């Protein structure tokens, strides 16, 4: 089942919440539900929508396009968006949750490195001299991040952008870049209801076995075992619920200065 909505320039997180909820409803009725959204704004933390899906025993696949902020592979100026995608898969109390942008580092992560003054672990993009750099501040200045997997991330970014704009009847990244602000984005919300499938118990068993097998991989660094995507997030969430949410010192000082 497929539905298309106009976000009417509304708050991105509220629009995304409503579309995720509707995609889940469609999935419960039809096994697969797809909702496409045009003319919306930044959806904030897409992992939350993945958690909404898995709470209803649905697989969730969500993505958005963005303003141009990444050069295509072989290019030197921004033509692609880093078009974040979230994939969520139910698994006991700790779902598999892949929440990634198509750039080496999300712009939120670049801000964290900029405030800390630490270099990135690998080159993350181009500086104003069009040279590779590990300096997050320089990448934030140019808005020219490297795509993940280099040419592969470049291709994925393009495909996600074109599919989102086509399904939503909305703007492509190129067209978003023509606006004075990052707005009128195109987004897709897909949910698949595992309860509708005849072998849902076998699916759950396969997920469990695959994750356990993955975690038995010999770690590169002793004392740092392999975790599946989403496991660390669950640990951090549990700690935050018990001990509170940590705030960077620089940000906390800004709060105190208000």
Where are the model-predicted features located?
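Catalytic-core signal marking the mid-to-C-terminal active-site face
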Residues: 167, 175-258
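A glycine-rich phosphate/pyrophosphate-binding beta-strand-loop-alpha-helix module
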Residues: 17-21, 25-63
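General beta-strand structural signal in soluble alpha/beta enzymes
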Residues: 5-7, 34-39, 60-64, 89, ...
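Secondary-shell segments that build the walls of catalytic and ion/ligand-binding clefts
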Residues: 118-176
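Phosphate/diphosphate-binding glycine-rich loops and adjacent basic-rich segments that engage nucleotide
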Residues: 70-137
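Active-site cofactor/substrate anionic-group-binding motifs, chiefly glycine-
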Residues: 1-24
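Glycine-rich, mobile lid/loop segments that gate access to catalytic sites or pores
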Residues: 43-81, 85, 93
């Amino acid at each position: 089942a497929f539905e298309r909505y106009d976000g009417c320039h509304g708050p991105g997180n509220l629009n995304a919440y409503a579309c995720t909820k509707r995609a889940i409803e469609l999935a419960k009725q039809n096994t697969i539900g797809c909702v496409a959204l045009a003319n919306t704004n930044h959806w904030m933390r897409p992992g939350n929508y993945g958690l909404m899906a898995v709470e209803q025993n649905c697989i969730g696949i969500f993505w958005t396009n963005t303003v141009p902020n990444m050069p295509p592979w072989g290019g030197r100026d921004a033509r692609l968006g880093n078009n974040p995608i979230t994939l969520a898969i139910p698994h006991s109390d700790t779902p598999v949750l892949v929440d990634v942008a198509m750039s080496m580092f999300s712009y939120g992560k670049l801000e964290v490195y900029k405030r800390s003054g630490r270099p990135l672990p690998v080159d993350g993009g181009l500086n104003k001299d069009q040279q590779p750099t590990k300096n997050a501040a320089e990448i934030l200045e140019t808005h020219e991040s490297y795509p993940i997997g280099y040419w592969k991330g470049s291709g994925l970014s393009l495909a996600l952008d074109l599919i989102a704009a086509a399904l939503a009847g909305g703007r492509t990244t190129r067209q978003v870049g023509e606006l004075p602000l990052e707005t009128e984005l195109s987004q897709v919300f897909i949910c698949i209801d595992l309860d509708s499938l005849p072998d849902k118990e076998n699916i759950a068993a396969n997920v469990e076995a695959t994750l356990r097998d993955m975690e038995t991989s010999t770690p590169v660094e002793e004392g740092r075992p392999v975790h599946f995507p989403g496991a660390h997030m669950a640990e951090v969430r549990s700690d935050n619920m018990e001990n509170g949410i940590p705030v960077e010192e620089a940000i906390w000082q800004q709060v105190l200065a208000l």
